[in-house]
Curated annotation (Swiss-Prot):
Region (Disordered): 180-201, 242-295, 558-588
Keyword Transferase: no
Subcellular location(s) of the protein: Cytoplasm
Keywords tagged on the record: Coiled coil, Cytoplasm, Repeat
Residue ranges of coiled coil: 70-130
Residue ranges constituting the Olduvai domain according to the UniProt record: 165-257, 258-329, 330-421, 424-479, 480-572, 573-670
Miscellaneous field: Encoded by one of the numerous copies of NBPF genes clustered in the p36, p12 and q21 region of the chromosome 1.
Record has Cytoplasm as a keyword: yes
Biased composition (Acidic residues): 259-268, 279-291
Organism taxonomic ancestry: Eukaryota, Metazoa, Chordata, Craniata, Vertebrata
Basic residues composition-biased segments: 560-578
Main location: cytoplasm
Name listed for the protein in its UniProt record: NBPF family member NBPF15
Source organism: Homo sapiens (Human)
Tissue expression per record: Ubiquitously expressed with a higher expression observed in breast and liver. Also expressed in neuroblastoma cell line.
Length: 670
């Protein structure tokens, strides 16, 4: 029996066919791809066969390079396509990541914008509440109101910029508008500077803090919109804080006192030098001001180490000023006394200044003399000078005691015997001013070597010390001779001492007490330094010569007096030369020599004795003048020999040479 196929069997067959078709489709695609590849290979093989055939006809070597080049280019082209596809895939992946990140940032920015709008609204409400005129007592000035109004305007502008409608505005427009508002706010502030008052610092700080806190959330933004918003906030904060600092600076400028400005002007003029101050105060000022000025230290005691080398020079200048003040006071006091009364006999005087110095009271001068010159505290670099000042102080005390004793002794002698003239010599052509005896005694009793000389002047200081010692020795010899003469005068007629007449003018008599006071002054109490030891021996030798000379003079005087008693006057008349027609018992003339025929003023006896007692080697000569030293020593010996063995003509020549040598030494010390 034949069974007919039903509908179910037909449906199953269709389902199987469809499934088979679906399974075979990918296989078909694969087969097609394989077929294509085979076609390409076949094409290549055909091409190769064609080329092989063509190669047979032509040379194989010529086509071989072309085939290699074509195959290489085909490979490169395929590799480039694959690389481009890979790059595009990677770029798409990166863009996708960036797009997702931007979407997240946009959502965050929208949230921040909402928060910023809320904060700006709250700030605006707060500022408006501050500006309300309901409470005038709490208002803090017109300037503060202007600043708060400007802050309100800036916050409103910020709200407008943060709105979504204005999100796409350019940054340049924002900057221009903010700059215009800042200029407008600064203009009324400059117009009202006169009415400004000090604004409390706390209110300005609160304003700046509120503004900065209200815009704080925008600091964390990083994209383009974030930078735009932070720029706006920085503008607001900078304008508020900058304006407050500017106002504070102006207030500080106005608060500066006028005294400080005056001090600044004085400082700009510069400090006045101490020399100019002393010159300005030197005219018509009482002596007390001088004492205060000279007793004040011109240099601070605590100096830097770098200035220690200069401190010694400053102190030496200070000491010179003290010495000059003392000499000026003495000279001026002598001139005042000379105008009031006439002096008995002029002495040697030295004019220190050509201009008139201010008059000074005697009590102030005594205060100046009694003030120790070494009261200034010297630094360590000035230690060599300190000992000299202490020695001078001791010398002043010793001189005061010696002066009192000498005055008492001289008062007794004045009651017994008259004064006797001394050895005289006239050095100057002009008349010298008469000076009171007391002031001159004080001047001559002052040590000549008042200031300690520096190291360069050590040769001269030794000479000065030796001369001081000579004065002391001569003063003692003169006192001895004077006593001998007084004893002889009691027995016979008075006889003058050894004298030398240079001119025919009669010499004025001077009080004996002042002269003895001058010669009895021990001015050589200062010890010589170690550097002067080579010169000391030579001066001691000269000192011995002078002592011997004084003793020989005493012997000659005694012999002369004995001859006078015996009637031997003829030889002495020849020595006298020009003096004739005297009485039966004329005084015995001394040695004399005439140097000049011009009339010259007379000089006191003590100054000439000092001149004759001065050795020709007053200033020590350097090593380059060694050849001339022997000549000077020979002159010195001639001086002594002619003093003992009197010859009028040779004595005159010797004294002339010594006088010239002495003047050359004084004028040209170096």
């Amino acid at each position: 029996m034949v069974v007919s196929a039903g509908p179910l069997s037909s449906e199953k067959a269709e389902m199987n066919i469809l499934e088979i078709n679906e399974k075979l489709r990918p296989q078909l695609a694969e087969k097609k791809q394989q077929f294509r590849n085979l076609k390409e290979k076949c094409f290549l093989t055909q091409l190769a066969g064609f080329l092989a055939n063509r190669q047979k006809k032509y040379k194989y070597e010529e086509c071989k390079d072309l085939i290699k080049f074509m195959l290489r280019n085909e490979r490169q082209f395929k590799e480039e396509k694959l690389a481009e596809q890979l790059k595009q895939a990677e770029e798409l992946r990166q863009y996708k990541v960036l797009v997702h990140a931007q979407e997240r940032e946009l959502t965050q920015l929208r949230e921040k914008l909402r928060e910023g709008r809320d904060a700006s609204r709250s700030l605006n409400e707060h500022l408006q509440a501050l500006l309300t005129p309901d409470e005038p007592d709490k208002s803090q000035g017109q300037d503060l109101q202007e600043q708060l109004a400007e802050g309100c305007r800036l916050t409103q502008h910020l709200v407008q910029k943060l709105s979504p409608e204005n999100d796409n505005d350019d940054d340049e427009d924002v900057q221009v508008e903010v700059a215009e508002k800042v200029q407008k706010s600064s203009a009324p502030r400059e117009m009202q500077k006169a009415e400004e008052k000090e604004v409390p610092e706390d209110s300005l700080e609160e304003c700046a803090i509120t503004c900065s806190n209200s815009h704080g959330p925008y600091d964390s933004n990083q994209p383009h919109k974030k930078t735009k918003i932070t720029f706006e906030e920085d503008k607001v904060d900078s304008t508020l804080i900058g304006s407050s600092s500017h106002v504070e600076w102006e207030d500080a400028v106005h608060i500066i006192p006028e005294n400080e400005s005056d001090d600044e002007e004085e400082e700009e003029k510069g400090p006045v030098s101490p020399r100019n101050l002393q010159e300005s105060e030197e005219e018509e000022v009482p002596q007390e001001s001088w004492d205060e000025g000279y007793s004040t230290l011109s240099i601070p005691p605590e100096m830097l180490a770098s200035y220690q080398s200069y401190s010694s020079t400053f102190h030496s200048l200070e000491e010179q000023q003290v010495c000059m003040a003392v000499d000026i006071g003495r000279h001026r006091w002598d001139q005042v006394k000379k105008e009031d009364q006439e002096a008995t006999g002029p002495r040697l005087s030295r004019e220190l200044l050509d201009e008139k110095e201010p008059e000074v009271l005697q009590d102030s001068l005594d205060r100046c003399y009694s003030t120790p010159s070494g009261c200034l505290e010297l630094t360590d670099s000035c230690q060599p000078y300190r000992s000299a000042f202490y020695v001078l102080e001791q010398q002043r005390v010793g001189l005061a005691i010696d002066m009192d004793e000498i005055e008492k002794y001289q008062e007794v002698e004045e009651d017994q015997d008259p004064s006797c003239p001394r050895l005289s010599r006239e050095l100057l052509d002009e008349k010298e001013p008469e000076v009171l005896q007391d002031s001159l005694d004080r001047c001559y009793s002052t040590p000549s070597d008042y200031l300690e000389l520096p190291d360069l002047g050590q040769p001269y200081s030794s000479a000065v010390y030796s001369l001081e010692e000579q004065y002391l020795g001569l003063a003692l010899d003169v006192d001895r001779i004077k006593k001998d003469q007084e004893e002889e005068e009691d027995q016979g007629p008075p006889c003058p001492r050894l004298s030398r007449e240079l001119l025919e003018v009669v010499e004025p008599e001077v009080l004996q007490d002042s002269l003895d006071r001058c010669y009895s002054t021990p001015s050589s109490c200062l010890e010589q330094p170690d550097s002067c030891q080579p010169y000391g021996s030579s001066f001691y030798a000269l000192e011995e010569k002078h002592v011997g000379f004084s003793l020989d003079v005493g012997e000659i005087e005694k012999k002369g007096k004995g001859k006078k008693r015996r009637g031997r006057r003829s030889k002495k008349k020849r020595r006298r030369g020009r003096k004739e027609g005297e009485d039966d018992n004329p005084p015995c003339p001394r040695l004399y020599g005439v140097l000049m025929e011009v009339e010259e003023p007379e000089v006191l006896q003590d100054s000439l004795d000092r001149c004759y007692s001065t050795p020709s080697m007053y200033f020590e000569q350097p090593d380059s003048f060694q050849h001339y030293r022997s000549v000077f020593y020979s002159f010195e010996e001639e001086h002594i020999s002619f003093a003992l063995y009197v010859d009028n003509r040779f004595f005159t020549l010797t004294v002339t040479s010594l006088h010239l040598v002495f003047q050359m030494g004084v004028i040209f010390p170096q």
